[in-house]
């Protein structure tokens, strides 16, 4: 959030300058800066007697005259912005009476209405259910790909950041900054160090979080594979029952999750017939259980 506030001129950097189109952002007038950059923050906007259309129309402020009168072209852009976030059906509703998901879409429509080069969003998926998160991020992705708008946003959900980002910046608690492509940043060992994960694990491949594995002599042997064993692994972990699993190919979709949760995983290299050694090992752990 601090970095974003430097980008949108809410805070001044302790050193250096923020440059946009080769120009210090502090040298832009308010209207010209608003034409370049729009902002969607997490703070709830308090309004009185304003419809959703009225709120979206505020995005035309940089283009209107002293009296703020909208032209037919402005009205067309307001309608387009509402349509782009699938909010035409709530355009005439009182903004203060709509849901959090709808409110976020209206605020995004207002930002779109400014016709900026850059949209900055601070934790836009906070307080949204999974459906509205997907819809919101889909809108942002379409804007970036189809309209060539630069989207800068902060997210706590790293699994979502992994899916939608071209570039990622991670800021560690001690101030260390990691910057790169999702493929460079979202690796299990990097995430473990970044968040100082000591108990449990995060799986970058699936974007899943696993709680700490239970240690001790395995009391259950799970013959999983193909993803069918995952729910059993998590159930056993939930009830604090140590278990072993196998025989699983190392390219099986559940292999990494089994490694995170099982005391012992009996595995084989991809596309190999199970060896006698693996079969004997599996039998041993079945007998132990």
Regions found by a protein language model. Name each.
Residues 134-147:
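Helical segment within the ABC ATPase nucleotide-binding domain
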Residues 8:
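Helix-to-loop junction immediately C-terminal to a conserved catalytic motif
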Residues 57, 72-92:
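Conserved ABC ATPase "signature" region
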Residues 119-123:
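Catalytic Walker B motif of ABC-type/P-loop ATPase nucleotide-binding domains
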Residues 195-276:
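ABC ATPase nucleotide-binding domains
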Residues 16-24, 33:
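Conserved ABC transporter NBD signature motif
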Residues 115:
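Conserved catalytic motifs of ABC-family nucleotide-binding domains
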């Amino acid at each position: 959030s601090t970095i974003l506030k430097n980008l949108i001129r809410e805070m001044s950097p302790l050193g250096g300058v923020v440059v946009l189109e080769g120009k210090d952002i502090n040298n832009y007038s308010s209207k010209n800066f608003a034409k370049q950059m729009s902002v969607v923050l997490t703070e709830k906007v308090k309004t009185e007697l304003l419809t959703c259309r009225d709120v979206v129309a505020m995005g035309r402020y940089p283009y209107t005259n002293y009296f703020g009168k909208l032209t037919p072209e402005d009205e067309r852009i307001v309608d387009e912005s509402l349509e782009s976030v699938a909010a035409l059906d709530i355009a005439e509703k009182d903004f203060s009476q709509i849901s959090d998901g709808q409110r976020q879409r209206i605020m995004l429509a207002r930002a779109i209405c400014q016709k900026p080069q850059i949209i900055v969003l601070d934790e836009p998926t906070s307080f949204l259910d999974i459906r509205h998160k997907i819809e919101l991020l889909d809108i942002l992705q379409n804007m970036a790909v189809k309209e060539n708008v630069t989207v800068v946003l902060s997210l706590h959900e790293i699994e979502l950041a992994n899916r939608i980002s071209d570039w990622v910046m991670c800021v560690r608690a001690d101030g260390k900054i990691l910057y790169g492509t999702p493929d460079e940043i979202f690796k299990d060992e990097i995430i473990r160090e970044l968040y100082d994960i000591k108990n449990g694990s995060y799986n970058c491949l699936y974007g899943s979080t696993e709680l700490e594995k239970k240690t001790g002599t395995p009391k259950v042997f799970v013959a999983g594979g193909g993803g069918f064993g995952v729910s059993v692994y998590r159930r056993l972990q939930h009830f604090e029952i140590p278990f072993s699993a196998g025989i699983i190919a190392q390219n099986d979709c559940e292999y990494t999750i089994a490694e995170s949760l099982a005391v012992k995983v009996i595995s084989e290299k991809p596309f190999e017939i199970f060896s006698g050694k693996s079969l004997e090992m599996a039998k041993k752990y079945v007998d132990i259980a």
